[in-house]
């Protein structure tokens, strides 16, 4: 079927990085961070897709229809029975890949948001559909929810599908992300999880997860106690020993440090902006490997899409 979208129709998308789990909130809590991938998508009059990747991943990720962003666009068009037009994409990537900062979720959300903008006026895609589509591709909503909606998100799945609740983060929370050179496969990290955990550990994490929500939205001084975990971080230590050692070192020194997502990046949640610098200095002093310190804000908007050109003629 021929696409009815006008040739030259162009949308611009911005998607934030995310950090999932935040210590105790395994597969549930996620935080949007002010570090962004930008995407421009233009409808062309020839079939297929081209992708110009700039920044992170340039020369490494696919530049054709197998690119994850293109796959997400196609998934969304198919979900609403819309023919896929030919597309030219320009991806300006800043989110590190394979570091536990939601890069794959950001790519998926970028594609879905681009499809929403391209189809605006033809098909209206609401927030529930955005989350459902993203979760279908990512497999779980803890990263895609904050990428879509910003802020702190609680994500869960019930009989109606994936759900989320967005919460505003206390302005005193100052995230620091420490990014190593090494990468980590999410699949590998998940494979290290045991099939069951002791009952007391489950209770421990339930209490800390509840406390963490309170700490992030109103009581940042509780962040150190609130970010304790017994469900996943130590089980994955063998795959990222230095990350695990640095988490324990930072916590011993009073910093609310956790593994970001599946790792191997570190996330430090401070109530004092000055703590970020001293935490970064401590890691630089103790590690023989380079770590990049990113002093970020919490993103409050989530993903955005804007139609910047309506185009001129129907695409072939």
Swiss-Prot record:
Keywords: Amino-acid biosynthesis, ATP-binding, Cytoplasm, Kinase, Nucleotide-binding, Threonine biosynthesis, Transferase. It comes from the Bacteria. PROSITE patterns: GHMP_KINASES_ATP (PS00627). One of its GO terms (cellular component) is cytoplasm. Signal peptide: none annotated. GO terms for molecular function: ATP binding; homoserine kinase activity. Its EC number is 2.7.1.39. It is an enzyme of class 2 (transferase). It is found in: Cytoplasm. ATP binds at residues 96-106. It catalyses: L-homoserine + ATP = O-phospho-L-homoserine + ADP + H(+). GO terms for biological process: threonine biosynthetic process. InterPro entries: GHMP_kinase_C_dom (IPR013750), GHMP_kinase_C_sf (IPR036554), GHMP_kinase_N_dom (IPR006204), GHMP_knse_ATP-bd_CS (IPR006203), Homoserine_kinase (IPR000870), Ribosomal_Su5_D2-typ_SF (IPR020568), Ribsml_uS5_D2-typ_fold_subgr (IPR014721). Pathway: Amino-acid biosynthesis; L-threonine biosynthesis; L-threonine from L-aspartate: step 4/5. Its main location: cytoplasm. Transmembrane segments: none annotated. Belongs to the GHMP kinase family. Homoserine kinase subfamily. Catalyzes the ATP-dependent phosphorylation of L-homoserine to L-homoserine phosphate. PANTHER family: HOMOSERINE KINASE, HOMOSERINE/4-DIPHOSPHOCYTIDYL-2-C-METHYL-D-ERYTHRITOL KINASE. This is Homoserine kinase. It comes from Clavibacter michiganensis subsp. michiganensis (strain NCPPB 382).
